[in-house]
Structure formats: structure tokens, C-alpha cells
Amino acid sequence: MTILFQLALAALVILSFVMVIGVPVAYASPQDWDRSKQLIFLGSGLWIALVLVVGVLNFFVV
């Protein structure tokens, strides 16, 4: 269970770094807004899911 928690936490940290760089770039680029908007919403949904998963796994690990 601990390894699963660590993997989920690592995925959350990596996705957070990607979103910190990717979202401002997507907002600043004038072309292909529809594709960028879908990627931002997909990344945001995945980020929220990972936060919930890490929270639940933290309950079981600690």
C-alpha cells in the first residue's frame, strides 16, 4: 500500500509541475485554443482525481 501511495504522490507532483508550466503557455499561445482548452480541462480533472486518491491512500498508510 505504501508503494502505491508513493507512486500516486509522485504522479501528483509531476502533473503539478507540468500544469504549472503548461497552463500559462496554453493561455499565452494564440493558435489552437480548442485543443489547449481540452488539455487544460483534462489535466485539471486528472489533478483533482490524484488529489483525492492521495488523500484516500494517506488515510490507509498513516
Curated annotation (Swiss-Prot):
Cytoplasmic side: 26-36
Keywords noted in UniProt: Formylation, Membrane, Photosynthesis, Photosystem II, Reaction center, Thylakoid, Transmembrane, Transmembrane helix
Transmembrane segments: 5-25, 37-58
Record GO biological process: photosynthesis; photosystem II stabilization
Gene Ontology CC annotations of this record: photosystem II reaction center; plasma membrane-derived thylakoid membrane
Lumenal side, ranges: 1-4, 59-62
Topology versus the membrane: Multi-pass membrane protein
Keyword Transmembrane: yes
Cofactor note: PSII binds multiple chlorophylls, carotenoids and specific lipids.
UniProt-listed InterPro entries: PSII_PsbZ, PSII_PsbZ_sf
Modification N-formylmethionine, positions: M1
Main location: membrane
The keyword Nucleotide-binding belongs to this UniProt entry's keyword annotation: no
NCBIfam families: PS_II_psbZ
Complex and partners: PSII is composed of 1 copy each of membrane proteins PsbA, PsbB, PsbC, PsbD, PsbE, PsbF, PsbH, PsbI, PsbJ, PsbK, PsbL, PsbM, PsbT, PsbX, PsbY, PsbZ, Psb30/Ycf12, peripheral proteins PsbO, CyanoQ (PsbQ), PsbU, PsbV and a large number of cofactors. It forms dimeric complexes. Part of a photosystem II (PSII) assembly intermediate complex PSII-I; crystallized from a strain deleted of psbJ, it forms monomeric PSII before addition of the oxygen evolving complex. PSII-I includes 3 assembly factors not found in mature PSII (Psb27, Psb28 and Psb34).
Summary of the function given for this chain in its UniProt record: May control the interaction of photosystem II (PSII) cores with the light-harvesting antenna, regulates electron flow through the 2 photosystem reaction centers. PSII is a light-driven water plastoquinone oxidoreductase, using light energy to abstract electrons from H(2)O, generating a proton gradient subsequently used for ATP formation. May also aid in binding of PsbK, Psb30/Ycf12 and the oxygen-evolving complex to PSII, at least in vitro.
Similarity field: Belongs to the PsbZ family.
Xref: HAMAP family: PSII_PsbZ
Protein name, per record: Photosystem II reaction center protein Z
